[in-house]
Amino acid sequence: MAAPGEALTQSGYIEHHLTNLSLAKLGLVADEASFWNVHIDSLFFSVFTGMLFLWVFRSVAKKATTGVPGKLQCFVEMIVEFVADNVKETFHGRNPLIAPLALTIFCWVILMNLMDLVPIDFLPYPAEHWLGIPYLKVVPSADVNITMAMALGVFALMIYYSIKVKGLGGFAKELALHPFNHPIMIPFNLLLEVISLLAKPLSLGMRLFGNMFAGEVVFILIAAMLPWYLQWVGALPWAIFHILVILIQAFVFMMLTIVYLSMAHEDSDH
């Protein structure tokens, strides 16, 4: 980190923009590795995008008309129908929570991912020079804490519905007697099933984090290597391509959530 008033080197610029505003950076906890060290910027922007989603959809729902709908209502209805169709095709149980959950995840992840299209210094520069905030990362889904928290939330629902639908005994039987239905294979079955079970939230969270973090790094590298008046030459093509990544990652996270919860609702003898 450069001294106050001193220009950052390329490596310093990259390191600065990859650093979260945390309680440790503000001296409120002793260690970066502390359990209580919260990434304030990731938490703020994840809550902000979540509240934005709720506000937009609530506003549209209150003003919805059976007559000629406005452009925003048409757009929201298109998203709702898209998610509902995917839930109908993929989820084979009966649970009124799944469609709203899938809609929330899809829209929330898209909004968090879209923060990656905000110019690199658009928010961090005024935050640092006008508000005295030393670090600011604006892409919540490029923070492994956020993506793994969402994945662990899905994992908790998987376990809850597996036990609720199959019973504790049925869930234990599924772990112990699959894929090989013989008592002597129980230890091997347990090892395979537990690894498979734990891999689901890990892959779910890390896939989203890895793709969004990589995209953020590319934008930072472009900003660090080119003068401000030429940055658009590299940033614009990457941003256009990155829009596809943003949408695909939100869709994948939503679909895997639906698939995992559908598996949790399946009868253990299915």
UniProtKB/Swiss-Prot annotation:
Q: Enumerate the UniProt keywords alphabetically.
A: ATP synthesis, Cell inner membrane, Cell membrane, CF(0), Hydrogen ion transport, Ion transport, Membrane, Transmembrane, Transmembrane helix, Transport
Q: What superkingdom does the record give?
A: Bacteria
Main subcellular location of this protein, as a coarse class: membrane
Q: Which GO terms describe its cellular component?
A: plasma membrane; proton-transporting ATP synthase complex
Record localization = Cell inner membrane
Taking the record's annotation, the residue ranges forming a coiled coil are: none
Q: Which GO terms describe its biological process?
A: proton motive force-driven plasma membrane ATP synthesis
Instruction: Look up the signal peptide feature and give its range.
Output: none
PROSITE patterns, from UniProt?
A: ATPASE_A
Q: What SUPFAM superfamilies does the database record attribute to this sequence?
A: F1F0 ATP synthase subunit A
Transmembrane stretches in the record are 37-57, 98-118, 143-163, 217-237, 239-259
Topology class, membrane: Multi-pass membrane protein
Q: Which GO terms describe its molecular function?
A: proton-transporting ATP synthase activity, rotational mechanism
Q: What biological function has been recorded for the protein in this entry?
A: Key component of the proton channel; it plays a direct role in the translocation of protons across the membrane.
Q: Which family does it belong to?
A: Belongs to the ATPase A chain family.
Q: Subunit structure of this entry? A: F-type ATPases have 2 components, CF(1) - the catalytic core - and CF(0) - the membrane proton channel. CF(1) has five subunits: alpha(3), beta(3), gamma(1), delta(1), epsilon(1). CF(0) has three main subunits: a(1), b(2) and c(9-12). The alpha and beta chains form an alternating ring which encloses part of the gamma chain. CF(1) is attached to CF(0) by a central stalk formed by the gamma and epsilon chains, while a peripheral stalk is formed by the delta and b chains.
The protein's matches in HAMAP family, at most eight in alphabetical order, are given as: ATP_synth_a_bact
NCBIfam families, per the entry: ATP_synt_6_or_A, PRK05815.1-1
Q: What is the official name of this protein in its record?
A: ATP synthase subunit a
Write down the species: Aliivibrio fischeri (strain ATCC 700601 / ES114)
